[in-house]
Curated annotation (Swiss-Prot):
Its EC number is 2.3.1.16. It comes from Escherichia coli O6:K15:H31 (strain 536 / UPEC). It catalyses: an acyl-CoA + acetyl-CoA = a 3-oxoacyl-CoA + CoA. This is 3-ketoacyl-CoA thiolase. Pfam families: Thiolase_C, Thiolase_N. One of its GO terms (molecular function) is acetyl-CoA C-acyltransferase activity. It is an enzyme of class 2 (transferase). Keywords: Acyltransferase, Cytoplasm, Fatty acid metabolism, Lipid degradation, Lipid metabolism, Transferase. The gene is fadA. Belongs to the thiolase-like superfamily. Thiolase family. The keyword Nucleus does not apply. The keyword Transferase applies. Catalyzes the final step of fatty acid oxidation in which acetyl-CoA is released and the CoA ester of a fatty acid two carbons shorter is formed.
Length: 387
């Protein structure tokens, strides 16, 4: 079976969804920009030699509809002979895109693929057009479709206090801002055209979602966002609304070697699981455990983790049940996470994987694990190994 390697991984800056840098930039353009950039950064691979493009996106309507993967590829002037498909596993969509491409390569059905994902939550809101079947209430609590209430449930079940959530959220912003100031994101962010507050077109090379002024004291003043009577989850401890895209060049090790391209890491294992929709945010725990089992590893073998921060109330129970509470500052989301950077749904799986690869190199560790919860009760995880 072919070994799957990651040759390159990039992303756009994360733009604010409300009046942010990409308010006049379409999701297809963000995607096409990264497709062009990956090919330009790796000229040894001819675009026509791509076997497929797998692109994650959740709200596949309006500008993100009608197979945005193909639309973006055409905009990027990828040869017409290269196919493209849009993948939807809600929050895990672009990580699922990676898994789909990896399996194609493992089985010999492909040698080189572009994978990634996008979500423009300013143009296509998360709830746009959502119409749950009324019969679902026979099997699933209605609140299971309200992500904030599932986070509240996890907080109650695991004893996660408001103070713990506020502290974790402040940490996310502080870490992300420190990474920005130190240039830690420089290798992953591709400058992307957008508009400043005055409407002037400019190139953005930083995440505008981060709030460096965030403090625990300021967060403590916010009201609960989902359960106004007894809730603990606030807007400040929830993932920010942002627009962005991320992309990876995935190949067989043999093809990369033949082209003289140096792999950054290989895909050691992959896992997807289901869980109770009412605690959808717990999905990373069984997903990570299964991925580790497939890799023949334990959590202690992993040098760095990227765990998507849907909510502080959600990620903290996952960290706790993976036995990592004492290692947060050494291993978990060292450059901040979605609370600071935002969670553009279809983008985030590739985004956290891209950040993870850079952290693995910076920390000089062998193994890294990226994982995320998925709305309506799923979890997805990938173990990477440097090569």
């Amino acid at each position: 079976m072919e070994q799957v390697v990651i040759v390159d991984a990039i992303r756009t800056p994360m733009g604010r969804s409300k009046g942010g840098a990409f308010r006049n930039v379409r999701a297809e353009d963000l995607s096409a920009h990264l497709m062009r950039s990956l090919l330009a950064r790796n000229p040894a691979l001819e675009a026509a030699a791509l076997d497929d493009i797998y692109w994650g996106c959740v709200q596949q309507t309006l500008e993100q509809g009608f197979n945005i993967a193909r639309n973006a590829a055409l905009l990027a002037e990828v040869p017409h002979s290269v196919p493209a498909v849009t993948v939807n596993r809600l929050c895990g969509s672009s990580m699922q895109a990676l898994h789909d491409a990896a399996r194609m390569i493992m089985t010999g059905d492909a040698q080189a693929c572009l994978v990634g994902g996008v979500e423009h939550m300013g143009h296509v809101p998360m709830s746009h057009g959502v119409d749950f079947h009324p019969g679902l209430s026979r099997n699933v609590a209605k609140a299971a479709g309200m992500m904030g209430l599932t986070a509240e449930m996890l907080a109650r079940m695991h004893g996660i206090s408001r103070e713990m959530q506020d502290a974790f959220a402040a940490r996310s912003h502080a870490r992300a801002w420190a990474a920005t100031q130190s240039g830690a994101f420089k290798n992953e962010i591709i400058p992307t055209g957008g508009h400043d507050a005055d409407g002037v077109l400019k190139q953005f090379n930083y995440d505008e979602v981060i709030r460096p002024e965030t403090t625990v004291e300021a967060l403590a003043t916010l009201r609960p966002a989902f359960d106004p009577v007894s809730g603990t989850v606030t807007a400040g401890t929830s993932s920010a609304l942002s627009d962005g895209a991320a992309a990876m060049l995935v190949m067989s090790e043999s093809r990369a070697r033949d082209l003289g391209l140096k792999p950054r890491a290989c895909v050691r294992s992959m896992a997807v699981v289901g869980c109770d929709p009412s605690i959808m945010g717990y999905g990373p725990v069984p997903a990570s455990k299964l991925a580790l089992k497939k890799a023949g590893l334990s959590a202690s073998d992993i040098g760095v983790f990227e765990m998507n921060e849907a909510f502080a109330a959600q990620i903290l129970p996952c960290i706790k049940d993976l036995g990592l509470m004492e290692q947060i500052d050494e291993k978990i989301n060292l450059n901040g996470g979605a609370i600071a950077l935002g969670h553009p749904l279809g983008c985030s799986g590739a985004r956290i994987s891209t950040t993870l690869l850079n952290l693995m190199e910076h920390k000089d560790v062998q193994f890294g694990l990226a994982t995320m919860c998925i709305g309506l009760g799923q979890g997805i995880a990938t173990v990477f190994e440097r090569v």
